[in-house]
């Protein structure tokens, strides 16, 4: 039934964010401040390589061009390299990326690249080792920096770095970040702190609009770039004097959802139409046999009829997202 995934608002979906675990070994203040707590799913309960192969095959048939593997921390899965290779079996999928805390990047970047990974996003919320430790609960700053070096050495031409923008934590460190990306092709993406079910107090204390940074970048001569159809939601800025780029992800900005091009599947096989939506559509019963592909594609396409025009974060409605590891942030 191959046809491009399109919703009731004529938005086309080229991008799948696929969570492969909700386990994480970091304790970031904005995500899992008390550390990972199993939610009734054992490691054996997460999608298998065969199930991942089937779900990505179905999405590829429906026009998906990019798959991002998320968590939790994806690299904690021992079969992570096999998962990359399984996704890469689909010729229609042109980009396979991972969002990682960088814990195992120095060790494994070359193997991931060889398996077919084309993009790496690393979470780095501070360039100060002590503050990094305070935010993540792990004294791994130098290890993560070595991982970014290893990614470049492995042949990744660009590395994306995700930084959650927090008032009185890192929002005043723009000059430090800019100096870091000046000589290197790093796309540094500042992500507005988002309210989650478990993070309301933190949100009220530390949220700051990315508009503040955008105004400053424009004042300094940074130029807004056009988005490609399978790009994520970042507004990307470049500057002739910098090898790196700046991205801004501002989910509270008006019309943020108008260009939505991505869907999410959780680590237990639920399709989520929005990071902050309700419920979810189970796909797992249709991931057990190759012969189920038509039914799987139909269920995915039919589910899109229910996708809302916008999220409801402005009303502090975070849907089922209790924390950002739940369905892959």
UniProtKB/Swiss-Prot annotation:
Its cofactor is [4Fe-4S] cluster. Pathway: Cofactor biosynthesis; molybdopterin biosynthesis. [4Fe-4S] cluster 1 binds at residues 24, 28, 31. Keywords: 4Fe-4S, GTP-binding, Iron, Iron-sulfur, Lyase, Metal-binding, Molybdenum cofactor biosynthesis, Nucleotide-binding, S-adenosyl-L-methionine. GO terms for biological process: Mo-molybdopterin cofactor biosynthetic process. S-adenosyl-L-methionine binds at residues 30, 72, 123, 194. Belongs to the radical SAM superfamily. MoaA family. Catalyzes the cyclization of GTP to (8S)-3',8-cyclo-7,8-dihydroguanosine 5'-triphosphate. This is GTP 3',8-cyclase. It comes from Salmonella dublin (strain CT_02021853).
